[in-house]
Structures are given as C-alpha cells and as structure tokens.
Swiss-Prot record:
This is Xylose isomerase. It is an enzyme of class 5 (isomerase). It catalyses: alpha-D-xylose = alpha-D-xylulofuranose. Its EC number is 5.3.1.5. Homotetramer. The keyword Cell membrane does not apply. Belongs to the xylose isomerase family. The gene is xylA. Mg(2+) binds at D306, D308. Its cofactor is Mg(2+). The keyword Transport does not apply. GO terms for biological process: D-xylose metabolic process.
Length: 436
C-alpha cells in the first residue's frame, strides 16, 4: 500500500536514450545482458538510508530544509520512514539498501533501549523485505554522531566507550545477519585525532586493531557469511583518520593479522579527499586482494570537502567499472549511492531524479567498461608494455632465481643497453574517449 509520500509517481522504467522523461531510465536497463550477465547483477545498486531518508538538508551555516513526516524520534516515525523507504526502493527497482543503526531506530535512554528499538525495527524490515524482495547489502553502526563518541569509539581513551561501541556493533552484526545482509561495514569517522598533544597514537591503533579482531571473531562465532569491510577516509570529521586510504588500511590489516579477513568499501569522494583518483583506490585494492564494495558519489572539486553528490562523470565511471570488472566483479559487494540531494532540492521527486541520474551514469560507465574489456582496449596495450617480463631471465629475477651477482653477469653477457619506450598516455586517453 502506498504511503502517499511520492504522490502518483509510478515505478521507474527504462525508456531508452532518446527519452526526455526525467522519471525514466535512459541507460539503466536491469535485464540488458552485459558480458554474459544482467546489468542489475553487475551493478548491484543500493540506496543509502542515511542520506536519502535521514539527512535534514542542513549545512554549517543553516539548519533543516527538508520537511519529512518521519522527522520525529519515535518508533511510529521510524516505521513510517521504513515504509516510505521500501516504497522508494520499489519505485526505483533497486535490489539492495544499506543502513546505520541510528538511521533506522529512535535513540534510546541507554544501550538496552537502543537494542530493543533496533530489534523492533528489524522485525519491521524483515516483513518489508519479504514483501518486496529488496535485500540488505550491508549494515553498520553509527559510532560517530552521539557525543559519547567525540573522542572516538574503538580508539577512545575511556574503556567504557570502547565497550559500549563494541556491544553496539554486536547488535548491528546480529541485525545484519538476521536480515540476510551480504556485508558488514566499519567506518571510523572518529577513529583518529584532532591533535597529537592529547593522543597516544600506538595505544589507539592497538585498540582499533583489537576492536576489528573482536568483530571478525564474532563473525565466525555466529556463522555470518558476509564480508567485513572497512571504508577508508582521510579526514572529516576528525583531522586525521586512521583508515586514511586503501594503502593505510592494508598496512593496518597486515599489522593486526586481518589481511585475509577484512576487505575495503571504497568511496569515490573519500578517494578524492585522500588526494587519489577513484580508479587508483580500486586498482590498489584489486592488487592487494582486498576489494569488496563501492560507495558511489562525487565531490565538488573546488570545495575541498566531502559533498556527497550523485555521480555524473561517465568517463570516470567507465574507468572505475573497468577496474571492478578486471578484478572479477562484485562478489558480496555492490554500488551503494552514498549521495544526498542538494539542500534546495526539497521535493520528493528530487530523491528519485537524483538516483535515476546516478544509475544511468553508472550504467553508461559499465557498458563502456565492458566493451573495453571485450576489445582488450586497455589490457592489450598493458600486456604489450610489460611483455619483456615474460622472457626466462626476467622471470628468474622476480622468482628469486637470480642474485644481484647473477643479474650483473647477465647484463654483461647480453650486453644490455635498454632504451626508453613511449608510455603512449595520450593514445590510451583517446582510446578511452572512443568508448564513452
């Protein structure tokens, strides 16, 4: 039954590239076959509960601009919000959604009440999932908004806060498992520091390492089959976060024996904040064997902060999905729209239009990426560039068959005098432009 929030808007359908209907897909056709698989199954779209249904439209200079009938801290309002959310998922035809605990339940007076509220709303979600077929891509705990976490959760100097956060994560993993979630995400928004003057860096890293190990231990104890994901971000809200980027997260995982247990959820906007491109973070995660999922959005390139806008750069999406496809595609992960409306976009249909545009952009990027994979447009030149490493002597250098002395002897015997070869960057950039 309709909540009435979206009026008489019907389910969004694919109408093709020539359509001018703002409430239709021009490029996202869920049943279109791409590289032998349905487009929907490649992209695995998810809606972010927090930005879509919780964010009030405020900024540092002004408060709420969105007026939503569920903006009350009561269970009835939480259930209304859920009803609208699942109606939204059905209108868009997305297969997944994601949430933090604080997005979906009213704030209780204590841990027990928070848990009770979460369990009650999970009951409601389970009914909605059964009725609609929409699934949970991942769940997570909000360990950054409440003032108790102002000094961090896992890295807090107060062990009581560590314990409260750990217990909260347990309840959220339980909720995620009950709802059939395919991943569980950890994002350390307050796991970092504002100043080293009051920070014991080694202690905080050790605390964080133990915290993540506790999560992994509990995952195995209860038989949770999903992936544990860490979402890197360099700063904001803290000045420096310990999950700065993919490379930093991998070093952390190696130090605490977690590199085979935890993967990464990479957000485009966070990559930009860290001084990287989105494709850099994806390529590195693939190279290190820790790629899990993506949060899709974009930042304003002039602002210098995390603006969480819907994606609209097709060439960037094409390169991103080229790395996803080259790594074998999503296993348990997907494309979560961690994006929010601009604060002046106050109409209900704006929520749909923002997601429609993002989904179309990703679909165009995926199709371009798939064609590049089929044609070996990028992998072919790459293989040729590194072909010299296929000769026996080169292989021996890498596999330990040559010492430095033996390498020197080979250089002398073969009278090696290597000459530089073009990297052909401009050619490859032009190749990409042919596909997008």
């Amino acid at each position: 039954m309709s909540t009435g929030f979206f009026g008489d808007i019907a389910k969004i359908k694919y109408e093709g590239p020539e359509s001018t209907n703002p409430l239709a897909f021009r490029h996202y056709n869920p049943d279109e076959i791409v590289l032998g698989k349905r487009m929907e199954d490649h992209l695995r779209f998810a809606v972010a509960y927090w930005h879509t249904f919780v964010w009030p439209g405020g900024d540092p200079f002004g408060g709420q601009t969105f007026e939503r009938p569920w903006f009350k801290d009561t269970m009835d309002a939480a259930k209304l919000k859920a009803d609208v959310a699942f109606e939204f998922f059905q209108l868009l035809g997305v297969p997944f959604y994601c949430f933090h605990d604080a997005d979906v339940r009213p704030e209780g007076r204590n841990f027990a009440e928070n848990t009770s509220n979460l369990n009650e709303i999970v009951d409601h979600f389970a009914e909605k999932q059964a009725a609609t077929g929409v699934k949970l891509l991942w769940g997570t705990a909000n360990l950054f908004s409440n003032r108790r976490y102002m000094g961090g959760a896992a890295t807090n100097p107060d062990p009581d806060v560590f314990a409260f956060a750990a217990a909260t994560v347990k309840t959220c993993i339980d909720a995620t498992q009950r709802l059939g979630g395919e991943n569980y995400v950890l994002w350390g928004g307050r796991e970092g520091y504002e100043t080293l003057l009051n920070t014991d860096l080694k202690r905080e890293l050790d605390q964080l390492g133990r915290f993540v190990n506790l999560v992994v231990e509990y995952k195995h104890k209860i038989g949770f089959k999903g992936a544990i994901l860490i979402e890197p971000k360099p700063q904001e809200p803290t000045k420096h976060q310990y999950d700065f980027d993919v490379a930093t997260v991998y070093g952390f995982l190696k130090k605490y024996g977690l590199e085979n247990e935890v993967k990464v959820n990479i957000e485009q906007g966070h990559a930009i904040l860290a001084g990287h491109s989105f494709e850099h973070e994806l390529a590195l995660a693939n190279a290190l064997g820790i790629f899990g999922s993506i949060d899709m959005n974009r930042n304003d390139y002039q602002s210098g902060w995390d603006t969480d806008q819907f994606p609209n750069n097709v060439p960037e999406m094409a390169l991103a999905y080229h790395h996803v496809l080259s790594g074998g595609g999503f296993k348990t992960g997907g494309t979560n729209f961690d994006a929010k409306l601009r604060r002046q976009s106050i109409d209900p249909e704006d929520l749909l239009i923002g997601h429609i545009g993002g989904m179309d952009c990703c679909a165009r990027g995926l199709k371009a990426a798939a064609k590049m994979v089929e044609d070996k447009a990028l992998s072919g030149p790459l293989e040729k560039r590194y072909a010299g490493w296929n000769v026996p002597e080169a292989k021996k250098m890498l596999d330990g068959g040559f010492s430095l002395d033996e390498i020197e002897a080979w250089v002398r015997k073969a009278d090696l005098n290597p000459q530089p070869k073009s990297g052909r960057q401009e050619y490859l950039e032009n190749v990409v432009n042919r596909y997008v």
